[in-house]
Amino acid sequence: MPPRPLDVLNRSLKSPVIVRLKGGREFRGTLDGYDIHMNLVLLDAEEIQNGEVVRKVGSVVIRGDTVVFVSPAPGGE
């Protein structure tokens, strides 16, 4: 049985992740929390374009219905 999305998020808590949003925006940060709607809280977040940091945003809440995918960040655990 494949892992459920919320189980994967739970294993990623306190780890660096990359989140891609509808419209192509990407954020990299430490996953601090989530809920059943896949709303995400990232700490020390940065907005990324073409692999480069565009700006540091610090703490950010991302609305779950805008999330395309969540992936472990390179160099993360």
UniProtKB/Swiss-Prot annotation:
InterPro entries: Lsm7/SmG-like, LSM_dom_sf, Sm, Sm_dom_euk/arc, snRNP_Sm-like_arc. GO terms for molecular function: RNA binding. Disulfide bonds: none annotated. The keyword NADP does not apply. Transmembrane segments: none annotated. It holds the Pfam family LSM. One of its GO terms (cellular component) is ribonucleoprotein complex. Residues 4-76 form the Sm domain. Keywords: Ribonucleoprotein. Belongs to the snRNP Sm proteins family. This is Putative snRNP Sm-like protein.
